[in-house]
Design a protein with these regions (language model features):
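Aromatic-glycine hotspot motif
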Residues: 1-184
Length: 184
């Protein structure tokens, strides 16, 4: 469980880094994250992408996440993004959804290349969401770390969440590269 101080720091960092940005800026930041993942995964073997890598702690990552593979990280990221898309749609319809316990997204089993198809399909839905939905709902959903978020705040969370895991994917691949270079 995070301390009050950690939660306040995370909230301030979120709102300064993403929450006060325009929808267009967050969309562009999300798109750059997808491009970065494409670049990181280019020409990396499936064996490496499905092999867990034990990485150093990073802000925003739970201890469980530190031992995931790239594919597991992508599966988790996609699951969270699908849930946020659903919450945004509910808020925009005038509903008041409940996010529930976010730790449920920390349980990811072994994953393979099949996760990429859904990940990229949902990423495209996220990139085009502002063209389809106004993101003006006044209704809110409570996030235990970031507080009360409307649909625009949730859209900002998509970009923030993606970049959190871009750095995780980069660290996993660097860990595998170090291991490979030691074996040579």
């Amino acid at each position: 469980m995070k301390s009050i101080i950690e939660i306040l720091i995370a909230r301030i960092a979120f709102w300064l880094g993403y929450g006060c940005r325009s929808i267009t800026t967050n969309r562009n930041q999300f798109s750059r994250g997808i491009q970065k993942i494409n670049m990181l995964l280019a020409e990396v073997s499936h064996d490496i992408l499905e092999t867990p890598g034990s990485i150093k702690p990073q802000p925003g990552l739970t201890p469980t996440m530190l031992n995931w593979s790239v594919y597991m990280t992508i599966e988790h990221t996609d699951q969270v993004h699908v849930e946020i898309l659903h919450l945004i749609e509910l808020l925009e319809r005038g509903e008041r959804p409940n996010l529930g316990d976010i730790s449920r997204f920390d349980t990811v089993g072994p994953a393979g290349p099949d996760v990429l198809k859904d990940f990229y399909k949902h990423a495209r839905q996220i990139e085009t969401l502002p063209d389809r939905i106004s993101l003006t709902s006044r209704n809110r959903v409570h996030h235990r770390i970031f507080g009360s978020l409307n649909s625009r705040g949730l859209y900002a969370a998509l970009a923030m969440h993606l970049w959190l895991h871009v750095s995780q994917i980069k660290a996993i691949l660097e860990k595998h590269a170090q291991k490979y270079s030691r074996e040579q």
